[in-house]
Amino acid sequence: MRVLATIGFSFSAGVFLTALLPWNGWQLYATGGVLLLALAWLFAARKQKYFRRGLLILLPLAVSLAYFAGYDHLVRQPIEDRCGAASDFTATVCDWPQATERGARVTVELEGYHRARAVLYGEAELLAARPGDTVTGTAQWQSAAHFDSDDVTHFNARGVYALLYGREDVRLSAGDGDALRWLPQRAGKAFREKVAAIWDDPRVSGFLTAELTGDKSAMDDGDYLAMQETGLAHLFAVSGLHCAFLVTLLALLISRRQRLLCAVTIPLLLFYMVMVGMSPSVVRACIMQIFLLIAPLFRRGSDPLTSLAAALLVILLCNPFAAASVSLQLSFSATLGMVLLSPRLYKLLTGWYKGKCRPLRTALCFVAANLSATLSAVVFTAPLTAWYFRIFVLVAPLSSLLAVPAAGWSFMAAFVAVLLGFVWLPLASLLGWISWALVRYILWIANGMMSWRYHAVYFTNPYLIYWLLFLYAVFIGCAATPDGKRKYLLASALSVLTLTAAIWVNRQDYQYGVLTALTLDVGQGESVILTSGGETALVDCGSSNSYKDPGGLAADTLHSMGVRELSAVVVTHYHADHTNGLYEVLRRIPVQTIYLPDIEDEYGVRERLVSLAEEKGAQVTYVTKETADTLGDTVLTIYPPVQSGGDLNELGLTALASAGDFDLLITGDMSGSTEKKLVETYALPDIEVLVVSHHGSRYSSNIRFLKSVTPEAAVISVGDNNYGHPSEETLQRLLAVGADIWRTDQQGTIRITVNGG
C-alpha cells in the first residue's frame, strides 16, 4: 500500500478544499466532523480490509483542515489586521528589485511575522537593494488577497500577504548580503548576466534566460505570445523537463555510479531550485527527481505517485495558500496525467505496428513517446487552461513533438555554455551557437504555427464549454468500455465535427443585425468592439487592473467572432488603461488602419504603437479633422480633440458609430467641460447608446452634454478602483435624462445588437 501517497494526497485534498472554498469558519467544524468520523471508523471497521487505509485518509484530512486554520491565524491574519492603514515596518530584502513605471518594487521578508513576505513599492532608490539588505520606514499596508471587491490568490500563493506602498522615509541599509543564505540569489543574477554576455541576440538571450531560470522579463513580447499560443510556454516554467535535462547532463558529465551521482546531483538540484525562485513546479520536479535518484540506493523502485504526493505535501506544509497557485495546479495536473495515462497511450500508439523495420520502429517510438506525454498532460490540464486562460491549443501535440526535443538540447547546451562562460567566455560564445540555432528553430516553429488560423480556440466562445464537456464524456466512455481501437477513431471524428459546429454557430451569432457593439469587461479600463457587415473595428483596449488581460480578452473574442482582420483601431488617448492591451491585439490580428490623436505623451505609448503598427504593416492616421469611414453597414466617424491643451484625457478622440438611425458614442476619458465643448463644436445626433466617459467619474457626463445627445442607454466600463468610479452624481445625471445604465463590473461584457437601421 502506498502509505506516503495516501497521506500526502489526503492532506492535500483538505488544504485544497480550505484554500479554494470561501472562508467562513467552517474548517474547524469540518475538522471535528472528520475526527468523529475517524473515531467511528476506528471502532466500526477495525476488522475490515480497508481499515488502515481509511485511517490514513481521514486523519491527514482532519490535520490539514486544522493546519490551514492555524497557519492562517498565526501567519496571514496578523498581517491582514495591519492592512488598510499606514504604519512602520522593518524587513529584509529577499530578491533582486525590479523597475516599475513609478520607481521600483522588491520582495521583502517582514520582521516579526514568521518570515512572511510582502512586496514593497517605492522610489527608484530601491533598485540599489541587494538580497540580505535591511529596509525600514513607513508604508501604506494593503492586503495582497483583496483588491476592493475582488479576491486575488496570486500573491498569497507565493507567500506574499501584503503590498507596502512606501512613504518618503523608507531607508535602505546594508545587511548580510554576502551570507551563504543569499548565495542562490547572487548565483541567479550572475547566471542571467552571463547569458546576456554569451548571446548578444536579445531574442535568443531572453529565451534562454527564461528557459534556464524561469525569468521571462527579458523575453521578446511577440515570441512569448507565440509560445503561449502554441502550447510551448511550459518550457519556461522550470519543472520536471528542466530537472530531467539537468540530471541527464550531470550523469553524462560525471559518472553513472549511483552513490556519486546522488552525492553530486541532489545538492545541485536543491541549489538550482532555490536559484530559480522555488516555484511550485520546480520544487515538485526536484523532489520527484530526488526520489528517483535515491530509490536504487535502498533497492526500491521509484513510485511516481508517492513522490508526487510527497512533493505536494512539502509545498503545502510550507505554504498552504500555494494550493491556489495556477502554476502548482498546472504542474501537478500535468504530472498526474503523465503518470496515469502516458503508459497506456504509448502502448495504444505503438501497439498497431507489428513490423520488424528497426528504423521505423525507433521513429514510431519517438513520436509515440512525445505524443503520449503531451496528450496525457493535456487531458488533466485542459479544464484548468480553459478556466484560467480561456484557451484550448489545438496544435499543442504537434508543436511539442517538433519543439520540445530541441528545447532539451538547447537547455543542456546553454547550461554547459554558461558554466564555461565563467571560465573562458570566447569558448562559451562558440559553444553558444548550438543553443542559438536551436532557439531560432523553436521560435520559427512557434511563430509559424501561431499564424495558422485554427492553431487554438478560445472560451470567449461559450459553445466551446459544452464541446469540452462532450469531449471528456466521449473519451471517458471509450476508456470505460471494452477494448477496441475503432471507438477512438469514431470519438475523434465526433470531436472534430462538434468543434467545427461550435465554432460555426458562435460566428453566426455575430452575423445577425446591422451592427454589434461589445463593451468588454476589462476591469478599470475600456475596450469596445464594433462589427458590421463583415468588418470590425476596435476602440481602445486597456486596463489599470494588473490582474486583468485586456489584450488577450479582446484578441480571443475577435478570434471567436471569426475576425481575421481589423478594419480600424481607434485610440482615444494614450493612457495605459485604454492602450496597454493594444500591443497584444496588434501582434495577433492584422490591422488595416490605426487612428491616433496627434498629441505627444510622456509615457512613450504613441511611439510604441507607431513602431508596432509599422512593423505589422498597419497604416497610421493622425486625426486632426472630422474623419468618416465605412465599417460594413455602419459609418464610423472620428472627431479630433476639441481642446488645445491640458491633460491627455481632454486631448482625446471621439468615435461615433451610426447604423441608420442608431448611434453609439464613445468619448474616451474626457471631462464634462470637454464634452460640453464637443457638442458645441460638432453637430452630434441624438444617440441611442453612450459609452460613458472616464468610467463614470464625477467630472464626466456634463448635464448639458447629456441633454444635447439624449442617450437611451449608458454603458459604463469600470472595475476595481480607488477613485469612486462610477460616482453617484454621474449615475443620477444619467438617470435624469432617462438613460438605462449598464455596467461591466456588474453585468460583465455588454453586447448590443442593432437589428435594423
Q: Model-derived features: where do they sit?
A:
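N-terminal leader/targeting segments
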Residues: 1-79, 284
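Core dinuclear metal-dependent hydrolase active-site scaffold
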Residues: 216, 316-324, 447-568, 614-689, ...
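Membrane-interface amphipathic/re-entrant loop segments adjacent to transmembrane helices
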Residues: 171-178, 182, 189, 229, ...
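Metallo-beta-lactamase
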Residues: 566-577, 599, 690-694
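Hydrophobic alpha-helical transmembrane segments in multi-pass membrane proteins
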Residues: 2, 14, 164, 221-396, ...
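Cap/insert and terminal regions of metallo-dependent hydrolase folds
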Residues: 593, 675-749
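Membrane-interface helix/helix-cap signal primarily in integral membrane proteins
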Residues: 60-234, 552-556, 565, 599-601, ...
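Aromatic-rich juxtamembrane segments at the membrane interface
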Residues: 9, 157-288, 293, 518, ...
